Amino acid sequence: MPDFSKFLFFDLEYNPETQKVREYGFILGEEYVRDRNPAKLESAASKAKFIVGHNVLRHDAPILRQYFSIKFPNVKALDTLMLSSLLFPRKPYHKLRKEYLHNEDDPSDPLEDARLCKKLLEDCIEKWGSYPWQLQYLLFQFLKNEPGFSPFFELVDVPNTLKLRLKIAEIQRWFTSNYEKAICLRQDFQNEWK
């Protein structure tokens, strides 16, 4: 597991009717905070190398830009909603499992959600390690430059692309044997990945 001391795991509780952040929760190293004060979150983000949230790119990033002085080019954003969808495709849904709520109408606890987000990232890293190297290679090639995914590849072992280029025929055979009934395979991989 990576050293999470420079990871800011966070969640925002935002009211779209009032267009205000009700509160936020975050974990940065040994610091666990649930607050409303923008300065604390901004300070924590300035110390972080990674910002990790569940649906961070579509939901939280616009709010962070609007209400806080947090600029994403300065940190790497990991989106556990996107990672969960990719790495656990058989799950019927990818919402955080908020078992701490006694009633569906209870307000979410952003600090508890930050803890859940951290656990989910740990699960994603573990799941990645269980994938065959061929699938790791394909996912890396397709997603290495995609927001929300690209920072993930700094946390996990990725097959050495230089060595694997020599094994492209083996990757093509593996992919065909595992996915030929699921998708159209009339594409020549050899020409695409040179």
Q: Model-found features: residue ranges?
A:
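DEDD superfamily 3′-5′ metal-dependent exonuclease/proofreading module
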Residues: 1-194
